[in-house]
Amino acid sequence: MIKPRLLLLALAALALVLAACGSGSSTTPTADGGGASNTETAAAVEGGILRIGYTDPPDGINPFVGSNQVSYVIFQEMYPALVQYDEDYQLTGDWAESWTVSDDNRTYTFELRPGKWSDGTPLTSADAVWTFETVLKYKDVSTGLTAGYIDGVESVEAPNDQTFIVTYAKPKATALANLQPFYILPKHVFEQHVGEGGKGLDKWDMKAEGELVGGGPFTVKAYDEKGTTLLERNPGYYGPKPNLDAIGITVYQNPDAMVSAFKAGEIDSMDKVPVTLVDQIKAMPDVQVEEGLVPDVVNIGFNANPKKTTHRELLDPVVKNAMAHAVNRDKIIETVYNGRAAPAASILTPIAGDYLDPTIEPEAYDLALANQLLDDAGYTKGADGIRTTPAGDRMSYEVILPTDIEGQQRKFEIIQEDWKAIGIETVGKPMDGSAAWDAMMAPDGKYLEFDLHMWSWLGYIDPDFMLMTVMCDQYGNWSDTGYCNPEYDALYAQQAAEMDPAKRVAIVHEMQQILYRDHPYIFVAQSEFIRAYKGGWTGITAPYLVYVSKIPWDTIGRTAD
């Protein structure tokens, strides 16, 4: 039951955010602003609404469907996880107050904090048992997006309401890190939607439910992926009581609309400030800007499925290598990102520490070399300058362009021009993120239609998740290329089980070398994450933390006037 005062506040906030509606990781964030700000040290007062602007809409409110950054921000606020990352990016407890590990490194015993779901139902270890068992049972039917996080779990048990035990078939170095994005769901709600053979879990249209049941610091009161999602404080939350009454997340159709709303005072914070407008925002009085490089890797993805019958030349390592040498990263970074990015060459980023292979470097921009590679391989230019394959097929490809990626069109134009210079024609296909994901997997998760895409991955601190996304068993789940290599998959299993950090690092380096050789992607740049807050807020954390921790939602609050 919602308290009347909170309901009135929430409805008022919703009205404000709707009126404004038009349409990531940093290890060393910096703060800047045009006016004096005491947001770093001021004490927070209880109450109030934080109104946040985004330009990329969530792609689902159902944890078995949603996969993008905004969806995971919502999941992080709504659902318990056993562990989370702290401000130093070290694993700490979330729902778990403490845990122990058996001598054989197979069994984890978690002692849980008492709490309640937002509808008043007790949150217990039975919810964890149900979530784990259900996800594993239906991983090939409807729960594949989340099943990878608990791969290798042999059994789970709940000896009492506040104790949860997970046993793995063999030691797993990645166990705790992978439990961070694995969210515990309310059994009494989700079990009603399992359906025959588990087929209902990813078909449940949760946005039609209105108010949803959550166990985190906030829970969804109203959801609109193209407008405003309102989250209210959960009185039964097991963690520190949040300062805020509610959070409003508004999606804008473009960055200019979001910035206009910010300037007009219609929102309090902007997620992903456009790099072209950062200096303008910094010049505003009483504004705090947090910025820094994030593990967000901008990439070009090839359709790597060998069963695709058209444009099979895109499977040729020579073609992909030539195209990689025709990507002008420096120009993209300066033109599209105003210098606020760094060249990328791996699926991992520096936040992964020693796991990032330092010997891998971006392919040198060299059009002469790219042309020579294609000439030597028998790809000949026609009268119009576009090449044909030895079989006589024209080398002209469609490139899927998700429109929620900053600077996407300009980035594509730079690459398109250089690829044309080496005899490869490309046609951009702009579409929203959900449509782009469907187009890549078409038909039915088989990756038989698309040629290339330009997107990005927001990586995790432990490398396991990013390495998992290109495995054979991620067809129809996390894979966005259709890449499958049994040699790579075998190494993935080895690194996951390797408890010696140095040996695991060596395996992960070898995996990156395979991806560099096979080129399911051309990695372009590691971008900055830039977030802005109006004055009057305290408890602001590093930009990336909102994706991997509830700490930002526990600490942020409005300062006293």
Regions found by a protein language model. Name each.
Residues 53-103, 133, 213-215:
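N-terminal lobe/hinge region of extracytoplasmic solute-binding protein
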Residues 147-196:
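Surface-exposed binding/hinge segments that line
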Residues 206, 234-280, 413-416, 425-427, ...:
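Ligand-site clamp/hinge motif
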Residues 86, 90, 182-242, 246, ...:
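Gly/Pro-rich hinge or "lid" segments in bacterial periplasmic/extracellular proteins
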